[in-house]
């Protein structure tokens, strides 16, 4: 979503190959237990350490939580934007009757040709490599954790759905956005089930673990931070699904390419909506918004599924991310490109009349993307071929990181 960034946390943007990074501390890993037992308060022995491991805790450490960091008077900004949101935000939603549904892309169970359609789907899926399925499954699991994302939006002061059926424009947007996003996980889940290439039970466990763990975006109930985060993430998912579409086509599965491309188009439309909110905030409060943008980038944007766990692998998100990086589905360069795009979209270079802190934030943001790209280029030049590891999602078949 004072915070201390853990340099080992998997959400850092310029990822290095897993073979060259130390493992991320985990609630389940020996390293975390070692760190915990070195604390004076926990020096009595392993039983005391073990007793602190509560059920349903995330698989890795989360940051110190900061709450309600937006000054209360700024809530009025979002109340004043109600009419603006109705006219400029809700237009990016599609009428349900005109929207695509998962069944539009899948074999029809009511038709006489259902079994033949499933056989054709499975034949096409046989041509897709295991590493592609690892990335597709990871993307699907990310989409299926939608309850967490709606919860996150409803933590934001001034825009949350206060009743569950609030008539405010902000609440209508959140519910309708969630309803549109819900189709993404449904469609990918059903496709993967029919493909016969994956271990659905392990995938379902991963989804349950992930929703139970939540997410740690470090947005502090602050809609400035929250909408900057969602602007970044919607563009990231647009890129990721667009790349899985392209690769499905390269492997000969035109139907899967259509599925991923359709989801990518939704993400692009949602990105447009969220970036418009932040653009309006820059118009109303340029100083506060540029400092919020810099704050999120200093903390580094964490991916929504960074607390992913399958019951076995504490470093599952790192491993999934490494495969996505190697295949070119979502990379450190993409992270820098998104930042560069948003800096241009919101015209950060052209902001004037800022405070001293605002000017510092502006300078930081304008220089950050080139710096990330330089770091990534050096990392790629030093990168070694990653090891092969088993993924439970594909029946423990091994895939190179």
Swiss-Prot record:
One of its GO terms (molecular function) is stearoyl-[ACP] desaturase activity. Binds 2 Fe(2+) ions per subunit. It catalyses: octadecanoyl-[ACP] + 2 reduced [2Fe-2S]-[ferredoxin] + O2 + 2 H(+) = (9Z)-octadecenoyl-[ACP] + 2 oxidized [2Fe-2S]-[ferredoxin] + 2 H2O. Ubiquitously expressed. SUPFAM superfamilies: Ferritin-like. Its cofactor is Fe(2+). Fe cation 1 binds at residues 143, 181, 184, 267. Residues 1-35 form a transit peptide. Fe cation 2 binds at residues 181, 234, 267, 270. InterPro entries: FADS-2_CS (IPR005803), Fatty_acid_desaturase-2 (IPR005067), Ferritin-like_SF (IPR009078), RNR-like (IPR012348). GO terms for cellular component: chloroplast stroma. One of its GO terms (biological process) is fatty acid biosynthetic process. It is found in: Plastid, Chloroplast stroma. Its EC number is 1.14.19.2. Disruption phenotype: Increased level of stearate (18:0) and reduced level of oleic acid (18:1) in leaves. Spontaneous cell death, constitutive PR genes expression, accumulation of high levels of salicylic acid (SA), enhanced resistance to Pseudomonas syringae, Peronospora parasitica and Cucumber mosaic virus, and enhanced susceptibility to Botrytis cinerea. Its main location: plastid. Homodimer. Converts stearoyl-ACP to oleoyl-ACP by introduction of a cis double bond between carbons 9 and 10 of the acyl chain. Required for the activation of certain jasmonic acid (JA)-mediated responses and the repression of the salicylic acid (SA) signaling pathway. This is Stearoyl-[acyl-carrier-protein] 9-desaturase 7, chloroplastic. The lineage of its organism: Eukaryota, Viridiplantae, Streptophyta, Embryophyta, Tracheophyta.
